[in-house]
Amino acid sequence: MHPLGIIVNPMSGRDVRRVAARASISAHHDKQQQVTRLVLGALQNGAQEVYLAREPFRISERAVENIAEKTQIKMLEFKLKHNAHDTVTAAKRMWAAGCRTFIVLGGDGTNRIVARTCPDAVLLPISTGTNNVFPQMVEASVAGAAAGLICSGQVPIEENCYRCKQVHVECDDGTTDLALVDAILLKNDQLGSLLPFSASNISQIFLARSEAASVGIS
């Protein structure tokens, strides 16, 4: 039996693709309602403790303010940097607290950060981003219940959870990284370009999975 960690990326589903690709917005209120259902589903199906982390928009804090089981909910506080490092810190703190199962609300990038930080964690990825391949659209109550069953040991990890493929990257300077979906080598790229538009700039593609129904490059 181990605690459940829930990590929310407040900025997922809110980038420039709302303009460039007419993508839908993942509102903070929607995420808040999802977190409420996740926590209730987990606690009612065996989880004894749920760890959350404060973020700038107080999504997690507001999600649990009216939940009766306050003693079973732990809210982590740390100095925010308002970038991806906050996800790293939350994952490390939750892992240190004993969390071995994580529900991640975000996109491919958020899940990549958690997988890189805690490579032996069980991830239940819920899509709140855009053009996601790794996380899935799933009802939060069902996801919470599944996580509760895993955390409580009622559903054994070894028999019901599988390890996903990864692409491991090593750069010339010795730094390493990993991808859960794809690693793309771009030519004529510019520093700070987070949304490459031209397919002619794609030099090489390394895929962990190839699915006809999945959209875009991660």
What are these regions (language model features)?
Residues 1-101, 116, 156:
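ATP/NTP phosphate-donor binding region
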Residues 22, 26, 125, 143-145:
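Catalytic, metal-anchored helix/loop core of enzyme active sites in primary metabolism
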Residues 60, 110-113, 131-135, 177, ...:
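Short, well-ordered, mixed-charge alpha-helical segments that flank or form enzyme active sites
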Residues 104-105, 114-140, 150:
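Short, acidic/small-residue loops that bind anionic groups at enzyme active sites
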Residues 156-218:
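ATP/pyrophosphate-binding catalytic subdomain of soluble kinases
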